[in-house]
């Protein structure tokens, strides 16, 4: 097969496409496209244009209507004539094989959807054998129903270079062209092998968790890029990789933390996101087991994000999907130093909205009813960290007494309190 040489220095340009529907208004669509742009940037692409269209629902054949597709095609043509090549078009929903095939036939350009973009980022971020295996399985699950389309367009688009390699063009990292040459039966066999590997990893991880001793397990959960790893570094007093990009953390990091006299285990897990591919959730079972088996969840929220309440809902839904709903939880609102609001003019008589509330006013809304289950901090600026440690200490101590009432390894001050 012909070899493809991909320039490392060249940044691929991308066009984003989203829909405004009855259940997704223009503001929400723009917010979703902002997130999609951040995903594209994390994958190494540069977003140069956005298109939106109002429809009752996505068009079953081409996602957008014929007129909008023609508008996108005209834009790409004009850019090419001006010697500004467009590398790809990314759609903000998962596309069917038929939709991808029809859109590619019309636009004659690489087409990605939100799912394939997220999978690509996971392939780029995967470092350990465990993470690479989980990502590869998820990619094959996504690829299988689209295999015919991938065969058709493989030679024109070029191949990837293996999950975790971080090389190759956006959307094509991971299994790569050698795997795409396989027939359906061979891919199914490969998936079966990957599942066996993950089952063995699950056993090993389960054994490791059982051997950690009589310690309460606390897991950091939350939307992606809310500051979990930064908080992990502060609490554990050890460096944990943190970066202002989505999915900076894929593999679970577990550290032993001691607050005052009380030791416990703290884990930093992969962040959640809207429309998280089901195949990823299924494939990352061994990673998410840290959340499922935790005694206490610290749900970290970026309060400076305009849609933080929806992000809370996304995380809670994902927790329910993986069987971790109903666990003891502390809601930790992070990044209070970055919180902003829109101050209304004195002559503005329109009703105040959430965007007009100061942080102090926001704290007096539904959050005030949560009492000690709700905290406000800045991990970056180390604001209210002592309050957080105090609350975590009390909750971990309560859980420890309940779970290990006869444990005698704790220090004298703790024994006196009991």
Regions found by a protein language model. Name each.
Residues 23, 55, 59, 94-97, ...:
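Conserved Switch II/interswitch segment of TRAFAC-class P-loop GTPases
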Residues 210-213, 234-264, 273-283, 308, ...:
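Switch I (effector-binding) loop of TRAFAC-class P-loop GTPase G-domains
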Residues 8-9, 77-84, 256-260, 265, ...:
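Conserved catalytic network of the ASCE P-loop NTPase/AAA+ motor domain
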Residues 117-138:
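Short alpha-helix plus adjacent loop in nuclease-associated cores
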Residues 1-16, 37, 148-226, 232, ...:
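C-terminal-of-GTPase-core extension/linker across diverse P-loop GTPases
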Residues 1-119:
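N-terminal accessory targeting/assembly segments
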Residues 2-5, 31-34, 57-74, 251, ...:
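Switch II of P-loop NTPase G domains
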Residues 24-27, 58-62, 97-102, 119-122, ...:
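Switch/connector loops and helix/strand junctions flanking conserved nucleotide-binding motifs
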């Amino acid at each position: 097969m012909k070899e493809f040489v991909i320039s490392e220095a060249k940044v691929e340009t991308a066009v984003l496409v989203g829909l405004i529907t009855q259940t997704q208004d223009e503001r929400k669509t723009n917010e979703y496209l902002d997130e999609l742009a951040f995903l594209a940037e994390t994958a190494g692409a540069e977003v140069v244009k956005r298109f939106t269209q109002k429809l009752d629902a996505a068009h079953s054949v081409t996602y957008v209507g014929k007129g909008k597709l023609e508008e996108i095609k005209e834009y790409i043509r004009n850019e090419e004539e001006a010697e500004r090549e467009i590398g790809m078009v990314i759609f903000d929903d998962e596309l069917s094989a038929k939709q991808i095939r029809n859109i590619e036939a019309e636009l004659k350009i690489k087409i990605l959807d939100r799912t394939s973009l997220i999978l690509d980022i996971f392939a780029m971020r995967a470092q350990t054998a465990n993470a690479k295996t989980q990502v590869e399985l998820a990619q094959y699950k996504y690829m299988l129903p689209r295999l015919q389309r991938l065969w058709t367009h493989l030679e024109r688009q070029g191949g990837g270079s293996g999950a975790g390699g971080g090389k190759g063009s956006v959307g094509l990292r991971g299994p790569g062209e050698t795997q795409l040459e396989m027939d359906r039966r061979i891919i199914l066999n490969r998936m079966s092998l990957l599942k066996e590997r993950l089952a063995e990893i699950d056993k090993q991880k389960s054994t490791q968790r059982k051997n950690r001793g009589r310690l309460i397990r606390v897991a950091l959960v939350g939307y992606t890029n809310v500051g979990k790893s930064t908080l992990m570094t502060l609490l554990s007093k050890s460096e944990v990789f943190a970066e202002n990009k989505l999915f900076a953390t894929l593999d679970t990091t577990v550290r032993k933390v001691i607050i005052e006299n009380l030791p416990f285990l703290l884990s930093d897990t992969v962040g959640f996101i809207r429309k998280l591919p089901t195949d990823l959730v299924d494939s990352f079972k061994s990673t998410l087991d840290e959340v499922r088996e935790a005694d206490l969840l610290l749900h970290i929220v970026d309060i400076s994000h305009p849609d933080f309440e929806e992000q809370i809902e996304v995380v809670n839904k994902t927790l329910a999907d993986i069987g971790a709903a109903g666990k003891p939880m502390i809601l930790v609102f992070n990044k209070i130093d970055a919180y902003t609001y829109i101050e209304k003019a004195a002559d503005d008589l329109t009703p105040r909205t959430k965007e007009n509330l100061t942080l102090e006013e926001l704290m007096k809304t539904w959050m005030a009813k949560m009492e000690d289950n709700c905290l406000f901090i800045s991990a970056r600026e180390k604001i209210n960290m002592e309050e957080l440690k105090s609350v975590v200490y009390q909750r971990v101590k309560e859980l420890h007494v309940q779970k290990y009432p006869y444990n005698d390894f704790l220090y004298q001050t703790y024994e006196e309190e009991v």
